[in-house]
Amino acid sequence: MFTGQRNVLLLAFSQALMLSAIVMSMALGAILGGVLAPDKSLATLPIAMMVIGTAITSLPAAILMRYFGRRAGFLIGATLGFGGSLLCAFALQQQSFALFVIGHFLLGSYQGFANYYRFAAVEATAASHASRAISWVIAGGVVAAFLGPQLGQWGRNWIDGNLFVGSYLAQAMLSLGALALLSQVKLKPIAIPRFEVPRPLREIFAQPTLQASIFGAAIGYAVMIMVMTATPLAILG
């Protein structure tokens, strides 16, 4: 037991639900994109837009949470995920590739907010337990690795005549679950230094440690996306 354990557990379960939704979209997005797209070369566009959504949202999410608090930002993110899942389900029902792409962008935005769960976990615990708190939250990915793909398979035939619409409806339920959990998180306001002078971006990006971190993260994420996107398409031929 450690200080802030309740908050950390809520964030860990929220992480598991969020990543399960993202993993499901990774597994199905390119396959269904190939079915809906007017040109098969656009099959992976939904996944690309999901990644772009995460990247574009990350900075605004940080700014929003800086002034309105972590919980408000997390609830907004989960709401975007819920809307994105419903939009994807509607897109499949209407056979609309454009709506399917937009839905995945919203799901990516959900992840952009949720990537801050681990930092909130650190803020909710004593410094001596920070590493354990981060580990618990990141461990949600282990659950997602199993739940995400199974969710897609489980819901594929929920709606007669609309293959995989049920999968995205089930995905929406994950976001609702995350909303319920996140509404119970109690975090202290983020301390904002009154006379803080921000460093120039040039100075920040000149740090070798930051450069190595960005390069490593970019390579790792690119390989992960490539494998998770291309494999389902290759299996189906």
Regions found by a protein language model. Name each.
Residues 1-5, 185-216:
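Juxtamembrane intracellular "pre-TM" segments in multi-pass secondary transporters
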Residues 79-94:
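C-terminal ends and interior cores of transmembrane alpha-helices
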Residues 5-6, 90-102:
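Helix-loop junctions at membrane interfaces in 12-TM secondary transporters
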Residues 101-140:
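Cytoplasmic helix-loop-helix junction between adjacent transmembrane helices
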Residues 28-40, 229-237:
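Short amphipathic helix-loop junctions that connect adjacent transmembrane helices
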Residues 148, 152-153, 172-191:
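C-terminal membrane-cytosol helix-exit motif in multi-pass small-molecule transporters
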Residues 210-237:
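Extracytoplasmic gate region of multi-pass secondary transporters
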